[in-house]
């Protein structure tokens, strides 16, 4: 006969949600930091291709 599974406690559910949200917040923070460094030109780990047209105009 089918028997319902035991219900997990709300504290376990809340803990799982907190871990997930914490990881998401950390990823968002890293993405914002990377975006800011790229926009300000302080990023050292990127190589940008320079178009020949831009060089000739300057």
From Swiss-Prot:
Query: Is Ribosomal protein tagged as a keyword?
Result: yes
| Pfam family name, one | Ribosomal_L32p
| Keywords from the UniProt entry | Ribonucleoprotein, Ribosomal protein
Q: What do the Gene Ontology cellular component annotations say?
A: large ribosomal subunit
One GO term in the molecular function aspect is: structural constituent of ribosome
The lineage's top-level taxon is Bacteria
Q: Give the GO terms filed under biological process for this record.
A: translation
Keyword Ribonucleoprotein belongs to the record: yes
> Which PANTHER family has this protein been placed in?
50S RIBOSOMAL PROTEIN L32, CHLOROPLASTIC, LARGE RIBOSOMAL SUBUNIT PROTEIN BL32C
Family to which this protein belongs? Belongs to the bacterial ribosomal protein bL32 family.
The molecule here is called Large ribosomal subunit protein bL32
Organism the protein comes from:
Prochlorococcus marinus subsp. pastoris (strain CCMP1986 / NIES-2087 / MED4)
Q: What is the lineage of its organism?
A: Bacteria, Bacillati, Cyanobacteriota, Cyanophyceae, Synechococcales
